[in-house]
Design a protein with these regions (language model features):
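Bacterial Sec-dependent N-terminal signal peptides
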Residues: 1-29, 33
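Surface-exposed, glycine-biased beta-strand/turn segments
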Residues: 22-104, 111-116, 131-140, 145-146, ...
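Long, low-complexity serine/threonine/glycine- and acidic-rich segments characteristic of extracellular
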Residues: 145, 187, 202-205, 212-357, ...
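Low-complexity, Pro/Ser/Thr- and charge-rich linker/hinge segments at domain boundaries
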Residues: 176-199, 206-208, 270-271, 354-377, ...
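C-terminal beta-strand-rich structural cap/linker in extracellular carbohydrate-active enzymes
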Residues: 423-434, 540-559
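Proteolytic processing hotspots in large secreted/extracellular or virion-associated proteins
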Residues: 445-449, 472-519
Length: 645
């Protein structure tokens, strides 16, 4: 095939880069790091570095703790505590230890720190009057030795259950793969597992089984390997996606595959080797996977090609970034090989048969289609039209501005004609078929890497050069009777991922008397509201978002809820909750003095932590809780001193 010579050159470079990366990482001896939970005892993981989560590549490893909190967490090597973070979300309670080799280990979702660190943190929290802190102690204030107990495991922050999250980072704070350091506590003899492969046409002239679009194929397992028995017919530019994951011994969890290689006729065309993930590029995860499939089905497909806007640098490919071109009748063997960190491997083998265009070989039609409809796949508009009763296909007339274009059907599926329009040629506003006109809701083509201002009657948007990964086709809409009294603003399709913030202005037709408590909320498919914020500027309300979809305006005039659980001289515990805009802040004072209250959003509880354990909690108690809309709830009570009882 035409790309073979290029592939051989790329492959040689790839092995050199791969070897250099491996050598740099493994300059650290295997026994340099101690396993931080029950060292020397067999353990299992709930997550690995490079695993596909719903919003990101998982970093580090999630070490299971038997469903309990409070296990000793050990320093992995000599060093000093360089950072301490406390947050109700994210990593929760976390320690960062810098080591003599320049690397940093991270221990997250902790229940509590050891006494000296704990007292230092509490002192800083009282000094700053804030539960959430990000501290950088003086170097060697807290020196540690390998094996020291530095904390106890927990479930703090955005943790779904008790475990220890453990990172190893290089001197630039990029995340490395802890399993590369050969911890004997983890056993993995299971090979990666494949569930599906997907092929996608990359332009309107390409076909898969003589059809345009994206098509998934189930696989058949044979030992640790997988096959697709029947050849898949292809023509033109084709991209490949893989739904696969790794598994480890004695655990049900799906974990990450760090290395995937795709070959055509024994020539490598794509390789990904995930050994390092820089946080500055982490949002590119949305362009590594098929984001649209994630949103529609929840499945996480690896793209085995480098899509436009993807800035990760752990790929090596052919000259077309992993996209395959088939233009000569021939049958080709594709092999996709997967390795996990422990070099367990499996492969998927299938044949691709390049044929010249003809009618589809598997005429299944489009079930339930009884009228014309359309969809967009990347840069192509696909129009489906039921063939008239006389059985004759008719050309479609596409209208774009003052121009019209007569387009024949690209192919026919049973009783449905399929018409393809390249949107980079121009945005059609309508199509006429059999004297029936269908209008398209495509309001603008928004380019990436350019600033762009969008204006409509109810929505305005400002896109920066970094807002988008790739060109999108924006559709906006407005419903003046949402939920009977509100209004709904439709801003694009959530099939598109967003790299960085888009500044959006909503221009409502309705009047909102209490603007101070009226804000923007995103609305999901189930009708749930999520606070997005916004500030009023004349008749517009402006906010920033990294999500396309539906938005509405809601006035929240209901204050948060406060429920006392424990109030005595030793401990204060409250449950706080807000049913719409969410908790923004809380503050508790005793005799006008600020009291530290830890916060766990999962349980909605706050609880007191004394600066001086010997000092009883007594006097005038005032707890103020404020939501994101500015509503405030105040609880007042008095704690009597012991000699007043």
């Amino acid at each position: 095939m035409f790309y073979r010579k290029t592939i051989l050159v790329v492959t040689g470079f790839m092995f050199a880069a791969y070897g250099l990366c491996y050598a740099q990482m493994n300059s650290v001896p295997d026994d340099y790091y101690l396993f931080p939970i029950k060292p020397g005892n067999r353990n299992t993981l709930a997550g690995t570095m490079g695993e596909l989560r719903s919003t990101h590549f998982h970093t580090g490893i999630d070490i299971r703790t038997g469903g309990v909190q409070g296990l000793p967490v050990h320093a992995a090597a000599d060093g000093y505590i360089s950072r301490i973070a406390v947050s109700p979300n994210g990593y929760g309670n976390a320690l960062y230890i810098t080591h003599d080799n320049g690397q940093t280990t991270v221990y997250a979702h902790l229940k509590e720190f050891t006494a000296p660190v704990k007292q230092y943190v509490i002192g800083e929290q009282y000094k700053r009057k804030s539960f959430q802190v990000n501290l950088f102690p003086p170097k060697y204030k807290f020196s540690v030795h390998k094996g020291d107990t530095i904390a106890h495991s927990g479930n703090s922050g955005s943790s779904a259950g008790p475990h220890l999250h453990f990172d190893i980072r290089n001197d630039k704070q990029a995340v490395l793969n802890p399993l590369e350091y050969n911890f004997e506590e983890i056993i993995d003899t299971r090979a990666p597992e494949v569930r599906k492969i997907a092929l996608k046409t990359m332009d309107k002239h390409s076909r898969i089984n003589n059809r345009f679009g994206r098509f998934e194929f189930n696989v058949i397992k044979s030992g640790n390997h997988y096959i697709i028995e029947e050849p898949i017919q292809v023509y033109g530019s084709i991209a490949v996606e893989l739904y696969a994951y790794d598994r480890q011994d004695w655990t049900k969890f799906h974990t990450g595959i760090n290395e995937i290689v795709m070959e055509i006729d024994n020539q490598e065309v794509f390789r990904q080797v995930i050994r390092e993930i820089p946080f500055s590029k982490s949002r590119n995860f949305y362009n590594h996977i098929n984001y649209r499939q994630l949103k529609e089905t929840g499945l996480r497909f690896h793209k085995l090609y480098v899509d436009n806007g993807n800035e990760f640098d752990f790929y090596t490919t052919n000259k077309d970034k992993g996209i395959l071109t088939f233009d000569t009748e021939c049958e080709h063997e594709m092999v996709i090989t997967m390795h996990d960190t422990y070099r367990n491997w499996s492969f998927l083998k299938l044949n691709l048969r390049c044929i010249l265009l003809s009618e589809p070989t598997a005429d299944t039609g489009i079930p339930g289609l009884d009228e014309s409809t359309y969809e967009i796949l990347d840069n192509t508009l696909i129009v489906y039209s039921v063939i008239p009763e006389n059985g004759r296909s008719v050309p479609a007339v596409f209208f774009s501005g003052l121009s019209s274009y007569l387009i024949d059907a690209s192919y026919t599926l049973d009783n449905v004609d399929v018409y393809l329009w390249d949107l980079t040629f121009g945005l059609p506003d309508s199509v006429e078929l059999c004297n029936t006109k269908e209008y398209f809701s495509i309001d603008a083509m928004i380019p990436s890497v350019k600033e762009y201002q969008f204006y409509s009657h109810n929505i305005e948007a400002s896109f920066s050069k970094r807002s988008l990964f790739d060109t999108i086709f924006l559709d906006v809409g407005y419903d003046p009777d949402f939920n009977g009294t509100g209004e709904l603003f439709l801003f694009g399709s959530d099939q598109y991922p967003v790299r960085s913030n888009i500044e959006v202005s909503l221009i409502p037709d309705k009047i909102y008397p209490d603007r101070d408590r009226t804000h923007v909320y995103s609305v999901d498919d189930a009708g749930n509201f999520y606070f997005s914020g916004g500030t009023w500027d004349g008749d517009k309300i402006k906010f920033k978002t990294r999500t396309f979809g539906a938005y509405t305006l809601v006035e929240d005039s209901i204050p948060p809820e406060i429920r006392p659980l424990i109030i005595n001289s030793e401990k204060l515990v409250f449950k706080i909750n807000d049913k719409l805009s969410g908790i923004k802040s809380y503050e508790l004072t005793l005799n006008d003095a600020w009291v530290l209250m830890n916060y766990d959003p999962k349980t909605r509880q706050i609880w007191s932590v004394k600066l001086d354990e010997k000092q009883p909690l007594e006097g005038r108690l005032v707890l103020k809780v404020t939501d994101n809309a500015g509503n405030e709830k105040v609880h007042k009570s008095k704690i009597l001193s012991q000699n007043q009882y």
